[in-house]
């Protein structure tokens, strides 16, 4: 039987647990999550265990990154199952604050980041998202003071924004991106996949197939607009409403015009039924 991790729900409890860890000169890796854990999250945990002596997983459904019309109230919350999975992975500490702990009465601060990584992708469709993400991640870094922090590459724009923020603000954590975990048919693992109807679940892997096809055409020498146009046709033909399909510089996320502009990342967001999915691939 797996030993349950220590669970901290208040800042004093978190600090006591971390003081014990730090007294042993142990390195700490943080895996920030919103719960509803799946194999993609557990891959982050396993890599964290290889990088650091102790692993902290935060579980906090962050209201600040949801718009009023989004799924904050219905977002999957599976605490007992999450804790069992983390116990099986031998996680050391789970940080599970509530909203009043993270955003107490009178809270009025926000971390705002700028630069090309923030422009023209998710921000166009979820304008308050990154202000909520950077603020909560900044708070988590201040609370846990990790040596390493692990984020999945599925949320690639988020990964680049958080990496830049940690570097610019000297937050002390080395941000590590971890390749996207996928279902057997290629669909990127996501807590929101549970929203998909059987019909939409069958169509969902088209998103990844379209990215792979566009990347293949780019490597074969196709013009970027032609390759992306073909990918967009595949996506809409499968029943998706496309938000964006773009080629960006893989490090800065600046828009690019040709393969010569640097390493390329293709990023897509699209909606099928009521579910919005994102994905990305390297070229």
Swiss-Prot record:
Biological processes per GO annotation: pantothenate biosynthetic process
Binding site for (R)-pantoate: 65, 158
EC number, as in UniProt: 6.3.2.1
InterPro entries reported for this sequence: Pantoate_ligase, Pantoate_ligase_C, Rossmann-like_a/b/a_fold
Binding site for ATP: 34-41, 152-155, 189-192
Enzyme's top EC category: ligase
Residues forming the catalytic site: 41
Pathway(s) this gene product operates in, as recorded in its UniProt entry: Cofactor biosynthesis; (R)-pantothenate biosynthesis; (R)-pantothenate from (R)-pantoate and beta-alanine: step 1/1
GO cellular component: cytosol
PANTHER family found in the cross-reference section: CYTIDYLATE KINASE/PANTOATE-BETA-ALANINE LIGASE, PANTOATE--BETA-ALANINE LIGASE
Assembly with partners or alone: Homodimer.
Protein name, entry field: Pantothenate synthetase
UniProt organism field: Rhodopseudomonas palustris (strain BisA53)
């Amino acid at each position: 039987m797996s030993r349950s991790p220590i669970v901290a729900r208040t800042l004093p409890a978190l600090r006591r647990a971390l003081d014990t860890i730090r007294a042993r000169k142990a390195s700490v890796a943080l895996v920030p999550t919103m719960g509803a854990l799946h194999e993609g999250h557990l891959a982050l945990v396993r890599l964290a265990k290889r990088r650091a002596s102790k692993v902290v997983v935060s579980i906090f459904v962050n209201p600040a990154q949801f718009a009023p019309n989004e799924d904050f109230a219905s977002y999957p919350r599976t605490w007992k199952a999450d804790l069992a999975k983390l116990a099986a992975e031998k996680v050391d500490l789970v940080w599970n604050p509530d909203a009043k702990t993270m955003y107490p009465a009178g809270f009025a601060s926000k971390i705002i980041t700028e630069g090309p990584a923030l422009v023209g992708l998710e921000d166009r469709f979820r304008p308050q998202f990154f202000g909520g993400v950077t603020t909560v991640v900044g708070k988590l870094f201040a609370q846990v003071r990790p040596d390493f922090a692990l984020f999945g590459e599925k949320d690639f724009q988020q990964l680049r924004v958080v990496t830049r923020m940690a570097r610019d603000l000297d937050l002390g954590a080395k941000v590590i991106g971890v390749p996207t975990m996928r279902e057997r048919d290629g669909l990127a693992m996501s807590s929101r996949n549970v929203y998909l109807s059987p019909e939409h679940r069958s169509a969902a892997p088209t998103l990844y197939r379209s990215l792979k096809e566009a990347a293949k055409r780019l490597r074969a020498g196709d013009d970027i607009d032609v390759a992306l146009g073909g990918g967009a046709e595949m996506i809409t033909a499968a029943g998706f409403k496309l938000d964006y399909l773009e080629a960006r510089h893989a490090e800065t996320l600046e828009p690019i015009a040709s393969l010569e502009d640097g390493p390329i990342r293709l990023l897509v967001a699209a909606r099928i039924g009521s579910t919005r999915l994102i994905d990305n691939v390297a070229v």
